[in-house]
Amino acid sequence: GGYQIRLFRSKSLLGPYVDQNGNPAISYGEIPDNQERGTGIRLTSSVQWDGGPAELADVEVSQGHNSAIRRSKDGRMFLVYHTRFAERFSEGDDEDYESHVRELLPTSDGWLVAAPYEYRGSVAVAPTGIADITGDYNVVLHDQHTFFNGKQEDDGTYVGINRPTRYTFH
């Protein structure tokens, strides 16, 4: 249940591949150490959104088996991956998953980030004024060190699940 999608890049196809801090993508230990060391830009993580009709079955976990694709007609990039769900996860049956697509967007320094929503064919439009961005937002920061392992706290919440923080812009 601990799949993670992390980003590294290189100036050469042959490498070396590094993260934003210059850490190498290659791990030399018995177990990959991206999680412990926090290497690589984490594009997705286990998350449970607040509000709406979401139930525990909607807690997204274990995003992985991904591909990045570039659409030739306009150069837009997309992340295609699978995700599993906390309440549908069991050690004996790990085949219940859904395929998802998110657009990849560049930051000002050229790194890619995944849009926070599934791609449904729409095109994002940049805001033109402060009125375009006022309101309440739920923001999830993808903790570099968390992962879903199926364990629950005494209150029923899952260990390793990122929760949103609410921000209001006036």
Listing of model-derived features with the role each one plays in the protein:
Residues G1-H170:
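Carbohydrate-active catalytic/glycan-binding domains of CAZyme proteins
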